[in-house]
């Protein structure tokens, strides 16, 4: 299994729609201002956060149960940024839609710009033949409110190509998060 380069990521995205929309360069400025970078890097792709957020709330005092998740645990916000309360959590989705080849597995890591502020980005691997918008999980580990910017980089996806094709892909087993189009809540 080997990590894939910028040339491979560019070719797979431009010829096969692996990432859509795809940015072939590393973007660090918008409207003359510095932003948290996104786009193609040497051995990965920095994904952006869309402007759709779900922020945890305790207004309804329900229990967080991954097998029986109550959507009332979240407040939905659509904005250019999201303020996550201290020691709290939010979900978002990527701007980019992914189509992962059958012989590829990705690992997604949060950007250090956010990590250095106490904001942890968690994303599970994108499995072979999974496709959809990625649901992003943000944890604010600080005692202060934390800001997430829509349209800017939040995490980096690394692509690993296997030496052989898997017997059963995510698509083959009808994975429950296949084709997700927005922020997707837990499914048991």
UniProtKB/Swiss-Prot annotation:
Q: Does the keyword Nucleotide-binding apply?
A: yes
Q: Which UniProt keywords apply?
A: Hydrolase, Nucleotide metabolism, Nucleotide-binding
In its UniProt entry, what is this protein called?
dCTP deaminase
InterPro entries in UniProt? dCTP_deaminase, dUTPase-like_sf, dUTPase_trimeric
Q: State the superkingdom.
A: Bacteria
Residues reported to bind dCTP:
111-116, 135-137, 156, 170, 180
Q: In which pathway does it act?
A: Pyrimidine metabolism; dUMP biosynthesis; dUMP from dCTP (dUTP route): step 1/2
Report the record's Gene Ontology biological process terms. dUMP biosynthetic process; dUTP biosynthetic process; nucleobase-containing small molecule interconversion
Supply the gene name. dcd
Q: What is this enzyme's EC?
A: 3.5.4.13
Q: Which residues form the active site?
A: 137
Q: Name one GO molecular function term.
A: dCTP deaminase activity
């Amino acid at each position: 299994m080997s990590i894939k380069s910028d040339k491979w990521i560019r070719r797979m995205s431009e010829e096969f729609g692996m990432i859509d929309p795809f940015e072939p360069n590393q973007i660090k400025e918008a409207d003359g201002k510095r932003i948290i970078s996104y786009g193609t890097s040497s051995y990965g792709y920095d994904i952006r956060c869309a402007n759709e957020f779900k922020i945890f709330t305790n207004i309804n005092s329900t229990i967080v149960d991954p097998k029986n998740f109550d959507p009332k645990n979240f407040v939905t916000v659509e904005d250019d940024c999201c303020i996550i309360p201290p020691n709290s959590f939010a979900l978002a989705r990527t701007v980019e839609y992914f189509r992962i080849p059958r012989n590829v597995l990705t690992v997604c890591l949060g950007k250090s710009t956010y990590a250095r502020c106490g904001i942890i980005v968690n994303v599970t691997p994108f499995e072979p033949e999974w496709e959809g918008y990625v649901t992003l999980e943000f944890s604010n580990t600080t005692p202060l409110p934390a800001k997430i910017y829509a349209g800017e980089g939040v995490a980096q996806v690394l692509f690993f190509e296997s030496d052989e094709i898997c017997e059963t892909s995510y698509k083959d087993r009808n994975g429950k998060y296949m084709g997700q189009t927005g922020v997707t809540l837990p499914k048991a």
